[in-house]
């Protein structure tokens, strides 16, 4: 059987942190594993949206940079050598007559005995700055993602938004940029209280309640933004080198909605085994929901072994759901 027709034990749809840990855990169970990821790299939103940000609620890490966590998860699963298919968005999943699954992507067809979906919030894209002329500066010095903090060294940066991402980025940019301003349409920020306290103590210029009403540039790059006071008459123009927009993201399940799974809003319903309404398909992480669900990376790390162990039992009912402890496996 060649690679094109190989039937894997477990195929993981989604290569974010929970998917990577699921791949490691499935490897510990001696499963053959494939990861299918729609993005060009592993790591999901951690790598794509905020690789430089620090995460504070991962067990065992007082603080860990998002990309560092992803790198560690990749290193952790490497001994089991899972097959990785990048830039492949899954279009459909169909159960075959023999009980295996056919997974069709935009590039290829894959086969698996069981599936674990770890697709996070599904497909996502940023809410864009809805102003004339803004689009021509996207990818130049209007940014929706930050992959390298050092590129802003010594530059005048404005951040627009009032949530955690906006405040966190402003605080991180303060360390490298020559000046940072944060613009929010309300007086109060929605970010975590601790972050807002740090913002108020920082050297960052806070512009509230203001909204950007005009972007000005020379065609090659943005040079100024005009701000207007909300429900007021004050307006001002800022000279900047970079404009970072943090209006949040619009997510969608996309084709997952058509796979025949039982859904609740934009989440897949699972039982205590992390099993979906289709036997053999399991979920872990933010993509799934159940009574009392809390959407955290740490929660997904706990759900992944449950999904994998029950998937192994589905493949072979003689297999124990409760495995040996890892300390025994690696001695």
Curated annotation (Swiss-Prot):
Catalytic activity: 2 reduced [2Fe-2S]-[ferredoxin] + NADP(+) + H(+) = 2 oxidized [2Fe-2S]-[ferredoxin] + NADPH
GO-annotated molecular function: ferredoxin-NADP+ reductase activity; flavin adenine dinucleotide binding; NADP binding
Cofactor binding: number and manner: Binds 1 FAD per subunit.
Cofactor(s) this protein cannot do without: FAD
Enzyme class, broadest EC rank: oxidoreductase
EC number(s) stated in the UniProt entry for this protein: 1.18.1.2
Keywords: FAD, Flavoprotein, NADP, Oxidoreductase
Pfam family, one: Pyr_redox_2
Binding site for FAD: 37, 45, 50, 90, 124, 286, 327
PANTHER family: THIOREDOXIN REDUCTASE 1-RELATED-RELATED
Subunit structure: Homodimer.
Family: Belongs to the ferredoxin--NADP reductase type 2 family.
Protein name: Ferredoxin--NADP reductase 2
Taxonomic source organism: Listeria welshimeri serovar 6b (strain ATCC 35897 / DSM 20650 / CCUG 15529 / CIP 8149 / NCTC 11857 / SLCC 5334 / V8)
